[in-house]
């Protein structure tokens, strides 16, 4: 099988390389979680893959296009939700042409898939952060790109919407054979949906491989600087990770 996203000897960063050269071969249907502490370079990696930030060395090869869901989006105009999502169809619409019925259908289908069809006519700027995140995911869906990148897709979402988004990520892989890469601080999210994980470590090092092998207690302790426990709860197929720290309180 031919990879749809390949990082070869990739060095990335704003001025100097954040990590040792990175090599990844992401296959159709694989879900990659990018884990690491704040400031480790997770978002910078996605910016490099999409070309927003030039690579310092090495190369990125993406087959079938790349759709990106950024952490935040501030449109310059007072756009409605359906207009923001329609932006994702730009490469399917001829220059200066009007959107076709198929484009509009794709927009409404994507909104319905995320349970936000009722927001289609709402001004994007009036939505909560979590609602805006769902709209941006819908925008990526309608682009029909083979590779979907999501930057902290669950960061602004409540628990119910986190489940919706993680289920969607799983469906993109298993039902549509898309290649998905998402950044997250939560190792449990990686264990729930990711087939593979890239763990960004201190000292310019990284680990990559099947998620159950990478998301181990010792690796997470080294990456985050806190003790953690990986637990297998009865009745649930995926382990969960909980930090083992306590908060000091004044003596009474």
Q: Predicted regions span which residues?
A:
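Conserved ABC ATPase "signature" region
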Residues: 101-119
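The feature captures the beta-strand-to-loop junction immediately N-terminal to the Walker
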Residues: 35-37
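Catalytic Walker B motif of ABC-type/P-loop ATPase nucleotide-binding domains
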Residues: 148-152
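Helix-to-loop junction immediately C-terminal to a conserved catalytic motif
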Residues: 50
């Amino acid at each position: 099988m031919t990879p749809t996203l390949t990082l070869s000897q990739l060095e990335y960063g704003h001025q100097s390389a954040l990590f040792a050269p990175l090599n990844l071969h992401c296959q159709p249907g694989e879900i990659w979680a990018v884990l690491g502490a704040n400031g480790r370079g997770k978002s910078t990696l996605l910016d490099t893959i999409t070309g927003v930030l030039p690579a310092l060395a090495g190369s990125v090869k993406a087959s079938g296009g790349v759709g990106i869901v950024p952490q935040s989006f501030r449109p310059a105009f007072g756009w409605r939700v359906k207009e923001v999502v329609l932006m994702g169809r730009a490469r399917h619409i001829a220059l200066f042409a009007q959107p076709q019925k198929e484009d509009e259908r794709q927009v409404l289908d994507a909104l319905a898939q995320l349970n936000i069809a009722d927001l289609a006519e709402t001004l994007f700027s009036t939505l909560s952060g979590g609602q805006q995140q769902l709209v941006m995911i819908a925008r990526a869906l309608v682009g029909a790109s083979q590779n979907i990148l999501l930057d902290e897709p669950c960061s602004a979402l409540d628990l119910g919407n986190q489940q919706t988004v993680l289920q969607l990520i799983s469906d993109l892989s298993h039902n549509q054979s898309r290649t998905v890469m998402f950044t997250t601080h939560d190792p449990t999210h990686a264990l729930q949906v990711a087939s593979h994980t890239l763990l960004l470590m201190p000292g310019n090092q990284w680990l990559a491989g099947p998620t159950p092998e990478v998301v181990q207690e010792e690796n997470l302790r080294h990456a985050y600087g806190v003790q953690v426990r990986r637990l297998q709860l009865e009745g649930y197929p995926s382990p969960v990770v909980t930090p083992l720290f306590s908060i000091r309180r004044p003596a009474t």
